[in-house]
Amino acid sequence: MNIKMISSVDHLIIAVRDLNQAINDYEKVLGISPCWKGKHTELGTKNALFNFENTYLELLSPCDAGPGTEFINSLLAEKGDHLAGIVLGTQNIEHVQEDLNRNGHAFEISSGEAINEKDGKIRRWKNIFLPNTLSRELFIFIIQHTEGNLPQHESQDSSKVKK
């Protein structure tokens, strides 16, 4: 049986210094508000997510001490606010890990969690982070969402798009 390892471009990550200003700017461009604002407590980062029909955009900012803050701060110091990563989606991260390991790589699966500031709901996922040697210096990881969903936005309001 041939199982598809990667099923989607799950989301794009934009590293930002000032999350509130970035939210304001992207609301004007996209015509929608973020469906989720939260914090990765174990990483020391906070984010805002703009959900679309088949993917979402994550604005990611440092906030507390942690490995995520160190990583985002290094990206921001080098390039300023910018497209920082691509996240590939899978339905079976263990299969992806087995396949990658079978091809001579040793990858561990890590877990993540975030809490929505708006309603306290929790989302959980599993990740495999790809090294720069495989991703050609682009921050890429593979994700399988395991618990919770992003709220869908009602509809895009073209009156919010500012010229």
Predicted ranges, named:
Residues 51, 60, 87, 141-144:
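Residues in well-ordered beta-strands of folded domains
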Residues 8-17, 48, 53, 58, 71-162, ...:
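Vicinal oxygen chelate
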Residues 1-5:
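Basic/polar N-terminal segments that are highly enriched at the extreme N-terminus
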Residues 6, 13-63, 102-103, 109-124:
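Core segments of cupin and vicinal oxygen chelate
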Residues 64-69:
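A low-complexity, Ser/Thr/Gly/Pro-enriched, surface-exposed linker/loop concept
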Residues 43-44, 82, 136:
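Short, basic and Ser/Thr-rich N-terminal targeting/leader segments
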Residues 30, 35-37, 56-58, 71-74, ...:
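Short, surface-exposed linear patches
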